[in-house]
Amino acid sequence: MRRIIIAAIAAAVVSACSSIDCPVQNSVYTNYALYKSDGGVDTLRDTLSVLTPTASGRDTLVFNRGVGLTSFSLPISYVNPCDTFFFGLKPQGDNTEWIIDRVVVNKTNEPRFESVDCQVAYFHNITSVEVTHNFIDSIVINNPKVDYDTERKHFRIYFSPRQ
């Protein structure tokens, strides 16, 4: 009888412990890879910054002064059906103006329930992308599924030919 009581107590203690593994950072990001018009990987020679408008009407800087990159990541909103970004490119040289392209990412949002103890995470499915063509020739959706995978490239950006 004593062994049964000890076994029951041990089972209760072990089952009371849980290992809930909530992600520390449950934000997801979209990854952009840069390509030349011939399909080869491109390296950003000029300075790139990206802003996004907020609900209050102000702009928020989400990527600042990237140079020498072949790829970069941007956050994506949780529940908005589309995200608007303003890509600003400052060509090399002291007296050059910023060139601005507007990029709109249309998407569906998929709430993901992981545990009662964790916040709801949102994954996304990219449905389309629109771009003005000031310095970006085109943006192609490479992989529409946005989740915790940080290695997956979601977009391929093809720049207009540069001098």
Where in this protein do the model-derived segments appear?
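Generic detector of short, locally flexible boundary/turn motifs and exposed helical patches
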Residues: 14-17, 50-54, 121-122
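Tryptophan-paired
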Residues: 44-96
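Post-signal peptide N-terminal segment of mature Sec-exported envelope proteins
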Residues: 26-44
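Generic detector of solvent-exposed, compositionally biased contiguous segments
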Residues: 3-5, 66-69, 131-135, 139-140
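A sequence/structural signal for flexible, mid-protein segments enriched
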Residues: 37, 49, 59, 113-117
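Sec-dependent bacterial lipoprotein signal peptides
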Residues: 1-17
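Extracytoplasmic cysteine-anchoring/structural motifs
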Residues: 17-24, 75-163
